[in-house]
Amino acid sequence: MIIGTGVDIVEIERIATLIKRQERAIKHFLTTDEQQLLHGKSETRQAEMVAGRFAAKEAGAKALGTGIGAVLSFLDMEILPNHLGKPVMTIKNEVYSKLDLDPTRVHIHVSISHSQSHAIAQVIVEER
């Protein structure tokens, strides 16, 4: 059963500007492991990666029906590539408790795409 779907789009330049102005802003959006993915990447690629994860986390919050706020923060969600490079979203167990969901029964589908100017993400949250 599908619990919810979410889509978000973000301007990559907006994220690039934010990163340049406030480097610590990345720590607000990305977990430590997600930040590690940025090492060795060009500024352009870093902005794309941060924008894509920002959009995916916003989409995930929409799919869960909470938005970003009291129940769910950017750091409650983590998006890391699997062995094939596919983005996999995990959510902290405390969030599942707040939402009265069983984490062993929830599957999250994530798709992230970029153009030169935008990053877009779609998330589907499914309970099995």
Swiss-Prot record:
EC number: 2.7.8.7
Pfam families to which the protein is assigned, alphabetical: ACPS
Catalytic activity, as annotated: apo-[ACP] + CoA = holo-[ACP] + adenosine 3',5'-bisphosphate + H(+)
Residues engaged in binding Mg(2+): 8, 58
Biological processes per GO annotation: fatty acid biosynthetic process
Domain of life the protein comes from: Bacteria
Enzyme class: transferase
Gene3D superfamilies: 4'-phosphopantetheinyl transferase domain (3.90.470.20)
Gene Ontology cellular component annotations, sorted alphabetically: cytoplasm
Major localization listed first in the record, in broad terms: cytoplasm
NCBIfam families: acpS, pantethn_trn
Family indicated by similarity: Belongs to the P-Pant transferase superfamily. AcpS family.
Job description of the protein: Transfers the 4'-phosphopantetheine moiety from coenzyme A to a Ser of acyl-carrier-protein.
HAMAP family: AcpS (MF_00101)
Protein name listed in UniProt: Holo-[acyl-carrier-protein] synthase
Organism lineage: Bacteria, Bacillati, Bacillota, Bacilli, Bacillales
